[in-house]
């Protein structure tokens, strides 16, 4: 186990959910990763990274071919979530902006297909919908038009951190 806390919190949550008769629904931010060295830079997608005065040396993205390293990493993590914790109720993907802008890089349908191959009953959710093949959407501040069923999470402030 390569976790600083030396605990697998997802496993603990999965066990607690099963014990309580609840389905495990997992959140995964596929559209932004501030720590992976090969995620998109701010020059391609503004919220992709914090706005540092100087780009940290750990950021190694130089061209779109580098993105495959991030995507392989994300797919491996999602596969782990689908195989290591028993049946899951679903996966809720977040930050859709980069996925909209670079749909050919993310190839989100391939990820959806992988999830459904491993966990056929799992629901797939992606904010306002990435490609229309989500089971439902969860708009925030606005409602998308790709998926027919949605839950609303509208904020009354100017910033989600308020």
Tell me the role of every PLM-derived stretch.
Residues 1-158:
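Mature catalytic domains of secreted/periplasmic carbohydrate-active enzymes
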């Amino acid at each position: 186990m390569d976790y600083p806390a030396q605990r697998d919190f997802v496993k603990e949550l999965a066990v607690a959910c099963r014990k309580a008769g609840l389905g495990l629904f997992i959140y995964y931010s596929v559209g932004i990763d501030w720590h992976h060295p090969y995620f998109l830079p701010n020059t391609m997608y503004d919220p992709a990274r914090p706005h540092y005065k100087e780009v940290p040396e750990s950021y190694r993205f130089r061209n779109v071919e580098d993105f495959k390293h991030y995507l392989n990493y994300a797919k491996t993590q999602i596969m782990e979530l689908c195989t290591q914790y028993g049946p899951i109720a679903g996966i809720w993907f977040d930050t859709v902006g980069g996925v909209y802008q670079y749909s050919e890089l993310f190839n989100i349908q391939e990820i959806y297909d992988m999830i459904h191959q491993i966990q056929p009953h799992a629901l797939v959710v992606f904010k306002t919908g990435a490609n229309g093949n989500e089971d439902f959407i969860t708009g925030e501040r606005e409602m998308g038009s790709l998926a027919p069923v949605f839950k609303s999470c509208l904020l009354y402030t100017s910033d989600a951190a308020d």
